[in-house]
Structure formats: C-alpha cells, structure tokens
C-alpha cells in the first residue's frame, strides 16, 4: 500500500512536470524563428528538442507507473531506443515495470 502511495506521488510529480513542459513548448512554438538572430533560433530549437526528449522519457516512466498501479497493460518490449537533439545521440532504456 505504501509503495502504491509513492507511485501515485511520483505520477503526480511527473504529470506536473509534463504540464510545465507543455506550457514551455507552447511558448517556444509561438516564437517566430524569422524574428530571431541565428544564435537565438538555435537556442530556441535546442530548448524545444530537450523538452521533447524529456517528455518522451517522462511518458515512458508514467507508463511504467501505470502498469505497476494496474491502470495499463505491459508492453511487449522495453527495448532501448535513441533520442537525438540534432547534435547529440542518447540511448534511452525505458524502465520496466516491476
């Protein structure tokens, strides 16, 4: 029971962060890149890429928590996959539900 409470708290925290990031993504997408200097446009794109990567990781964590709480079914595979921001490549292994 206490583990379930911790999982629910983790989900709430992840959802709050997700909501914050969605708002940040909306603000970034409202910015017209043509009005920015090349450096500002590059920073805007990098910020958007990082937010998107965090959202992907967060969704996988939310799925794992949902499975552990009985809200979702296990996936067939939790294989690692590659995230990229245009410059860097990151291998991400989603957490397998317990």
Curated annotation (Swiss-Prot):
Alphabetical GO biological process terms: DNA-templated transcription termination
Keyword Transcription regulation (UniProt): yes
Alphabetical UniProt keywords: Early protein, Transcription, Transcription regulation, Transcription termination
Function noted in UniProt: This N protein may have, like the lambda N protein, an antitermination activity.
Protein name: Probable regulatory protein N
Annotated organism of origin: Enterobacteria phage phi80
Gene that produces this protein: N
